Amino acid sequence: MSENEIVPDEFRCNRSDGKQWRCKRRALEGKKMCESHHSQQSLKRSKQKVAESSKLVRSRRGGGDEVASSEIEPNESRIRSKRLGKSKRKRVMGEAEAMDEAVKKMKLKRGDLQLDLIRMVLKREVEKRKRLPNSNNKKKSNGGFSEFVGEELTRVLPNGIMAISPPSPTTSNVSSPCDVKVGEEPISMIKRRFRSKNIEPLPIGKMQVVPFKGDLVNGRKEKKMRCHWCGTRGFGDLISCLSCEREFFCIDCIEKRNKGSKEEVEKKCPVCRGSCRCKVCSVTNSGVTECKDSQSVRSDIDRVLHLHYAVCMLLPVLKEINAEHKVEVENDAEKKEGNPAEPQIHSSELTSDDRQPCSNGRDFAVVDLQRMCTRSSSVLRLNSDQDQSQESLSRKVGSVKCSNGIKSPKVCKRKEVKGCSNNLFLSLFPLELTSKLEISAEEVVSCYELPEILDKYSGCPFCIGMETQSSSSDSHLKEASKTREDGTGNFLYYPTVLDFHQNNLEHFQTHWSKGHPVIVRSVIKSGSSLNWDPVALFCHYLMNRNNKTGNTTDCMDWFEVEIGVKQFFLGSLRGKAETNTCQERLKLEGWLSSSLFKEQFPNHYAEILNILPISHYMDPKRGLLNIAANLPDTVQPPDFGPCLNISYRSGEEYAQPDSVKKLGFETCDMVDILLYVTETPVSTNQICRIRKLMKNIGRVRSKNPAKGRESRFDKGKKRDRLDDYSSSDSESSQHCLGAKCRGSEFEGEERESCNYSCEEESLSNTYGAQWDVFQKQDVSKLLEYIKNHSLELESMDSSKKKVSHPLLEQSYYLDEYHKARLKEEFDVEPWSFDQCVGEAVILPAGCPYQIRKNKSCVNAVLKFLSPEHVSESIKRVKELNQLPQSVKSKANKIEVKKMAIHKISEAVKEIRELTSSDSTGALRLYN
């Protein structure tokens, strides 16, 4: 083959440099390369060195084929070696001027971007060297890289600005420390830089966090374990929290503060639960004792909707109050010689001290207008009562303070008032105010679309199809009756507390507006460290009573204690007894008012407020739908709780009779939370401890008899609450009232001879109370049944006192026999259900109910006033006012009408403020 032969492209060797050059020799048959290149490729595959003689030399750009290296003249090889040597020397040179000259000699196009960038970098370095005279010294010390450190190079390009970040002098080929995770091996990332392919990355170890200086100083000191409360040291008596692994508590403080068992504290301490009340934790968690502020989370739109709902429910009550005002004024005008002119009406300026109930017991809940006699300094309270047959206008008279500040002992008689020429109407709420308030409330209601009001006797649309699933654990219905004609009335709403977390009250309000009770599950939070054991609570209270004798109330005015010992002799009556055993018995009934509950058990009191199932209705301070919340000074605040009810019975004879709450109803709404249920008998140590604490109280009272009498006199009214619960007392039991135990025969030697031992048993069933709840419309039938069977019911009641109103006085309890007779004669059947631990029973106002406790229970009771049942509450208060004074003194005085008027006024005012601040939000709300 001649060297000048032109080979077609399809037969040419495929060897090329990838750009322009390609071998012009002919490829071998069946191969893609020529003979020379094929042999070179074979040597490279076998990892052998290619001989210099077999390499081809490219021809210059003028043309010509490649020739072998053996054909090159010696002079030409020398020239080539000189050229290569010069290029190597130029690379070694570190001077920027020499590199700039070499670049200038390169024959490249002027539009080459890479060459332009290199030239720009070199120019910047030359200019920087001229500005910095000491650059040569820095270059020697830093190994030639100092001029690139700390400076950022930028280049303005047609489409933007390009920046070249400077390299790090120490870690030139390692990624940034921010890209390395703590405690893991870093990944070496080589930064792309000119002529830096062969530079090996510098080794780097695991990155670690250096401790803070304060931690290093504290770490040098030996960690000392101290009790979180008392600061006591010691390893043996301290219990460490496994949750935080930081707090320690001694055994004495745990027992003294009643913070649960050792296992509960070890699992999760009070600091972790947020129930610690020490100074440090109180400063950190200042808002723990307050009610949970659910309104802060609720949006303004939801708040306005709730206020609108309250106004819509209370507007009929306001209209009724204004109608009664109008009737009072018109009737009084007719009495004055037929003069139809409107009498002069003045607003009341009476303080809370002056607004006391009259001697005849007229409660201020129904007092709207008063007639004041200027001569006798008395007040004639007027109220329309259409139920009385004597007169269409009922007038009750009571004394108030005279101008000299002394109470008038005489009561202004009707004939004396009739002779008075200076009679003036005294209105606690001016008619102008209530009439304007009614107009404003109607305007608010017209802008709000209420949901469709269903018939009280119709079924709930949310519960359709759930009746068949009532037996399942996730059902929202609970079967409480089986023989009602209306199948939907056999079931009660049975939600969990989680169902109310998203302000989902529509389903609840559907059942609540019908007057049905609601049972809420899972109210008590899991993992609570508070101890609700009744014996422990009573002992804790007695200890506080001993420590603070002069400041606290008399404990026996709130507790009824019965202690007894029964001995058993087994064996021959004549001979020596083979076995001599005894059994301790304890009966404990107590009712703690809200003030005493908060004073003696602040942690338990705060826990009750935190676990309220529906805070919008039940929060006593911030409940948006609670009419009794956030009252002004002009309205007497009622004592709605929460209160604590303790019922404990131990021993064989005390386990047989049932402690019951007799049939009756409340004048307001109520929620009852079952906190604790036990069947564990009391131990001898607990009985001895109670006796010892009660003896200490009696010893202190004997020294200060005046304080004891004064305390019993002040709190004597509270003893009547214990009459609601009845139980059969055995002859061997000893009744202790007022810290003086009449059972003096229980000496220490006799107690030590008792070998009673008890073991705690796990309760398979956690229910402790059985409820029977009747409907509001069944009140008249219940009264008629009690009237017909009063002799049978009185035989069951040991008190045998005169009864004016069986339901208001809570005088009788209907057992299974009487409930069956009631169903047979009047077709009235209650909702009967069992209350388990952690369940809250929400009861509407006016619903008759009775409770039978099968076990020892501790429950909290809180009363509230919902807008749906204000009318029913007013009706029940009127019935209560017609009873004798002895009965009314037991009831909690509530001023329902005043609270309703104040709630409407505040709701209308707040709605206007919220809607006027954001006009767009108001438009979205109303449209």
Swiss-Prot record:
This is Lysine-specific demethylase JMJ28. Residues 7-52 form the WRC domain. It holds the Pfam family WRC. Residues 80-91 have a biased composition (Basic residues). Belongs to the JARID1 histone demethylase family. Zn(2+) 2 binds at C241, C244, C269, C272. Disruption phenotype: No visible phenotype. Decreased hypocotyl length. Delayed flowering associated with reduced FLOWERING LOCUS T (FT) and CONSTANS (CO) levels due to increased H3K9me1/2 level at CO locus. The keyword Secreted does not apply. Expressed in inflorescences, flowers, roots, siliques, leaves and stems, especially in the vasculature (mainly phloem), with highest levels in floral organs. Present at high levels in flowers, shoot apex and young seeds, but observed at low levels in dry seeds, root apex and anthers. May function as histone H3 lysine demethylase and be involved in regulation of gene expression. Regulates flowering time by promoting CONSTANS (CO) and CONSTANS-LIKE genes (e.g. COL2 and COL5) expression via interaction with FBH transcription factors (FBH1, FBH2, FBH3 and FBH4) at their loci to remove H3K9me2 repressive histone marks. Also modulates the expression of several developmental genes such as MYB30, TFS1, AGL6 and RVE2. Interacts with the FBH transcription factors FBH1, FBH2, FBH3 and FBH4. The gene is JMJ28. One of its GO terms (biological process) is transcription initiation-coupled chromatin remodeling. Zn(2+) 1 binds at C227, C230, C250, C253. It is an enzyme of class 1 (oxidoreductase). It is found in: Nucleus.
